[in-house]
């Protein structure tokens, strides 16, 4: 059984990622960052698998650690003095915590974008924006397809060159550099030819011409209507919370945030449910499928 959120209408997919990525970048409250990172990790594991998640974390965790270490080295604001660096600049608790928050934000956004690239295929982008902004939608769809295609083609070219005795891992430094440049030249040529072929193909099909019709496999059903209303509610409620400073948190010059009240807790609860929407939809669909299967066996 595939991912139910992937099978939703493209408008629902795009609206969810637009809201959750925007909130992940703008809401730097520690609770919001934790919810966003947890939701991104969980959905990445269900969508791409645990092995792919581990591969992402291998470079996301060092990136988060680097952000946490670099910020205190260059930013010395804050009132909680911990120590003095060898340069004589103060090391403050606020600068360390802000670095950790920035690292969590970068990690969550990176994981959400990885999910976006898997769910929002090129066909969905062209379906949503093909008539309104055909040039931009084509560029976005080509960009989303480019990275995985480039990786597959690079592995194929590198393997072919290795069989021809042009390995980039063996030989002298000069020979390895020459072989690597050869592979790079082949990949650049392939990328340009692929872009030209795609542009010629779309032009020959009348893409972007006024009055052009297109076949669509997407249907906006009751489930999509319910999810769309839910996402609009979450977006409006979180926007109201941000404007009312219910989700605010300041790291400088001292740690200050919204007071823990019932309305503040409701903002956090809505944000948590928003981040867990794809996973919750998958869990509900799996539970319904197992119930139907169990009922069929009973009958």
Give the ranges of each region predicted by the language model.
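Transmembrane alpha-helix interface motif
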Residues: 2-45, 156-299
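Membrane-helix interface segments
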Residues: 30, 49-50, 133-136
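Short, charged/polar low-complexity linear motifs in solvent-exposed/disordered segments
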Residues: 32-34, 51-52, 143-145
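Membrane-interface helix-boundary motifs at transmembrane edges
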Residues: 46-55
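Juxtamembrane/interface alpha-helical elements of multi-pass membrane proteins
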Residues: 56-174, 290-299
